[in-house]
């Protein structure tokens, strides 16, 4: 069985714009996804990237154009300037890590739910009520938002170190075997790779 390690942050517009295509690809190929939320700002700093405020204006403008194009392409509405952004991604990341450990729900729906809440629904995904609601909607015990936070925080740090050591430098980032794919616009390539065509 193929395995896909998925490095992401819940506050990335491009994680949101990936929708559930990764999950669809994994289902087609019988692949297993391991969800690995990371501190994207720390990942950028460690691998030569720049946080959005430090990027050149042309890069910022292109980002907005690309967000609009991908939104239209995939039928996912997006607010390019959400009410609660930037927002601390750690609480939602901890909830995802705890949910993955606990099992019983739909992790893909949980990840997409947090990203959608941020980028399409103007919700504060660091707020406990929002976290509990997203857990419940994805079939998990909402009480996970209060349990296992220390171990989840440790896993969050480990995910960052692992991402750096495995050559990830942005989000979303997908690794299967030795093959790396950066960006939701590379999901088609991941699909072709798993099909043995690329």
Provide a role label for each language-model segment:
Residues 4-5, 10-31, 109, 113-198:
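C-terminal cap of thioredoxin/glutaredoxin-like
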Residues 10, 17-118:
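Structural alpha/beta surface segment adjacent to cysteine/selenocysteine redox centers
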């Amino acid at each position: 069985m193929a395995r896909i390690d998925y490095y992401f942050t819940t506050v990335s517009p491009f994680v949101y714009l990936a929708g559930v295509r990764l999950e669809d690809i994994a289902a087609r190929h019988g692949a297993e996804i391991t969800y690995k939320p990371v501190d994207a700002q720390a990942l950028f700093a460690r691998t030569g990237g720049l946080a959005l405020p430090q990027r050149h204006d042309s890069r910022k403008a292109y980002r907005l154009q690309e967000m609009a194009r991908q939104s239209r392409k995939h039928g996912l509405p997006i607010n390019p300037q959400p009410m609660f952004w930037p927002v601390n991604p750690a609480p939602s990341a901890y909830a995802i890590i705890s949910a993955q450990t606990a099992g019983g729900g739909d992790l893909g729906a949980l990840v997409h739910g947090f990203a959608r809440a941020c980028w399409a629904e103007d919700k504060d995904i660091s707020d406990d009520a929002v976290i509990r609601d997203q857990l419940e909607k994805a079939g998990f015990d909402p009480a996970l938002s209060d349990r296992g936070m220390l171990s989840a925080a440790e896993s969050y740090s480990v995910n960052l170190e692992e991402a750096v050591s495995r050559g990830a430098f942005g989000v979303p980032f997908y690794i299967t075997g030795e093959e790396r794919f950066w960006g939701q616009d590379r999901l088609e390539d991941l699909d072709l790779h798993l099909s043995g065509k690329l």
